[in-house]
Regions:
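Bacterial N-terminal signal peptides that target proteins for export
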Residues: 2-17
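C-terminal motif of bacterial Sec signal peptides marking the signal peptidase cleavage site
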Residues: 24-27
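N-terminal pre-ligand scaffold of iron-sulfur
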Residues: 31-113, 143-158
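Acidic/polar residues at beta-strand termini and the immediately following turn/coil
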Residues: 46-48, 120, 128
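Short cysteine-rich clusters marking metal-coordination/redox-active sites
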Residues: 97, 119-120
C-alpha cells in the first residue's frame, strides 16, 4: 500500500515540503542586502559631446565628471561620471559609492594618474570603466543611468 494514499501522511509530506521551501527561500539573502541602497535623486543631463569641455569623450574609454548641479542639468546624488565605450556608446554612473553610501566621503572619482578605472579613496573600492567591481569592500557595482545619443547631444536620465 502506498504510504501517500493515507491522507495524514500526504498532509505531513506537504507540510514538510513547504517548511523546506520556506527555509531555502529565507536563506537566499546575500551580504549586499546589509548595505543601504543609494538614495534616489533626479538625473536629467544634456551635454554636447563636441563641446571642448567634454573633449575626453571623443576617444574610447575617455571619461568626464559632471557635478550634481551644473550647466548640463541635474546630476544625481553626488554627480555623474560619463564614460565613452565606443563611438556612439556612452555609460553614465552615479559618483556616490555603493559601500556606505550615506558616508560623507563616499565619492567615486576617476583614478587621476591612469584614468583607466574609478575608485572611492575613502573605502578603497575600485570599479572598471563599465562600473563593475574590481576591488574593495563594495557589495555592488556602480549605479548606472540611461544614456541616449542624438547627433552630438548626449542625454543622461534615470
Amino acid at each position: 500500500m502506498n504510504s501517500l494514499a493515507n491522507p495524514r501522511m500526504r498532509q505531513f509530506a506537504l507540510f514538510t515540503v513547504h517548511c523546506l521551501l520556506l527555509t531555502v527561500l529565507a536563506a537566499c539573502g546575500s551580504k549586499s542586502d546589509e548595505q543601504p541602497l543609494i538614495a534616489y535623486a533626479p538625473v536629467n543631463l544634456s551635454l554636447n559631446v563636441t563641446n571642448q569641455q567634454y573633449a575626453a569623450l571623443r576617444a574610447d574609454n575617455g571619461a568626464v565628471t559632471l557635478p550634481v548641479k551644473g550647466p548640463a542639468g541635474d546630476g544625481g546624488v553626488k554627480g555623474v561620471i560619463v564614460v565613452r565605450q565606443s563611438a556612439g556608446v556612452f555609460l553614465a554612473f552615479e559618483r556616490n559609492c555603493p559601500y556606505q553610501p550615506y558616508s560623507a566621503c563616499a565619492l567615486v572619482s576617476l583614478d587621476r594618474p591612469s584614468r583607466l578605472f574609478m575608485r572611492d579613496s575613502c573605502c578603497n573600492s575600485q570599479f572598471d570603466l563599465k562600473g563593475q567591481i574590481t576591488g574593495g569592500p563594495t557589495p555592488r557595482p556602480l549605479k548606472q543611468y540611461s544614456t541616449s545619443l542624438q547627433g552630438s547631444l548626449l542625454n543622461i536620465t534615470n
